[in-house]
Amino acid sequence: MPIIKSAIKRVKTTEKANAKNSSQLSKMRTAVKKFEKAKTAGADNVEQLFNEAVSAIDKAQSKGLIKANKAARDKSRMAARLAK
């Protein structure tokens, strides 16, 4: 455990940021999985789920949780999957 006041604060802020980042990444992964599952099942709302997944990916990328290249790659693969 840290003793210095600034170190205590850093631990708190790091834990808070970690929780927020984990939540955001989880939302992104869930949105992508929902799209994949709906596409496999042939659901009607695939287009809407695609848009939600792309939005979640863009949000994660803008917050620095994933790199720009990964975001582009994931969106490209999903778009190709949607077109099939």
Curated annotation (Swiss-Prot):
Reported function: Binds directly to 16S ribosomal RNA.
UniProt entry tagged with the keyword Transmembrane: no
Q: Which family does it belong to?
A: Belongs to the bacterial ribosomal protein bS20 family.
Statement: the UniProt record of this protein carries the keyword Repeat: no
Any one Pfam family here would be Ribosomal_S20p
GO BP, sorted A to Z: translation
Cross-referenced InterPro entries: Ribosomal_bS20, Ribosomal_bS20_sf
Q: Keywords of this protein's UniProt record, alphabetized?
A: Ribonucleoprotein, Ribosomal protein, RNA-binding, rRNA-binding
Q: Which GO terms describe its molecular function?
A: small ribosomal subunit rRNA binding; structural constituent of ribosome
CC annotations in GO: cytosol; small ribosomal subunit
The record's listing under NCBIfam families reads: S20
Segment forming the signal sequence: none
> Which gene name does the record give?
rpsT
Cystine crosslinks: none
Q: What is this protein called?
A: Small ribosomal subunit protein bS20
